[in-house]
Amino acid sequence: MMLRRLCEVVSMPLTRISRHERDMAGDILIELLKLGSAAMRQQTAQRLAALADSPKRVTLLLARDDVSVARPLLEESTALNDSDLIHITQTASSAHRRIIAARKNLGEAVVDMLAIHGDVQTLSVLLLNTTASISITTMDRLVRASRDHATLVAPLLRRQELTPAHAFAVFWWADEDGRRAILKRFAVDRAVLIASASDMFPIAAEDNFADAVVRKALQYIERRQRNRAAMARSPYGTLEAAIDAALAKPDLFVINEIAYICGIKPVTAAQIFGDAGGEAVAILCKAVGLKRDYVERLWRALRRPVSPDPASPFQRMAFAYDSLAVAKAQTVLRYWNWALSSDFNRNDLGKAEELDEDASVARQAAALVLGRPKRV
């Protein structure tokens, strides 16, 4: 009886009772709740969940209780502010965190803490919560988590906060459907970027591209399909001749020559040619203007089997080749080459989580992609 009366008092609006009187009633209620049954605490939590200004101490006590008690407060209570939710995230159970992760209109600070403390199930719930605001640093954390937990990839790719840097990294461990979604959304034309930087090429050429940062940026922006200087230096002369040589006798030298003629670094080529799925090879071939017969010759030169099975890597490669426009394939290839090679540091491999937040996007991408086993 006393518990019910006190619940009625603390549930009164502040137009009927002073805040101080209600808080004192709440202090007494806390002691009764600690000694009361779970059913009593559930009833109280259900009642307080509908109040916008329920007594804070009582609300926090019940919100940290067993999830059977805490659920309505964690799901609905507007009396719990971001600070309260962060505290609960840090101190309560995984079940509490999963309920909070599904809460409407979560702010970035709460989401950050959930990403730090949450298990894979919590992260999955969080990614599916379209009303949650996810910061760029937490997106970085979620992308890293998706490397080792494939169930996170699909909901991650649906987030509006996902950037090209994130997407083109996730590509390497996404499945076939995920890769198609990435290419459809992020493989865009660079027309505006190319036009805005068109006058920079002759200026940089006057200095023989001495500024390394500018040179690497222009390598991403440039429109050329192949590296003419590399073709002039190569003993093969053309990309097609290099592919023929690789088909006859593959070795590291000719594979590197193919990379240079394509305008990419060997580290990028190794990632592309070693990709089990096939789509990466298709992107390279389309970007450099390789005809269909030489696409298959390159595939064979890499000692990859040609199969009619629609689910085979060869058919996945062929589908991607036929689906992509040249300009869009160039965007992806150039971005990969810039991201994987412009700030590559072997000491970062396997240590993406340890990099400083101020590390360049390219350095983070290289550590993330090159520092893990390949899978599709």
Give residue spans per PLM region.
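Alpha-helical scaffold segments
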Residues: M1-V376
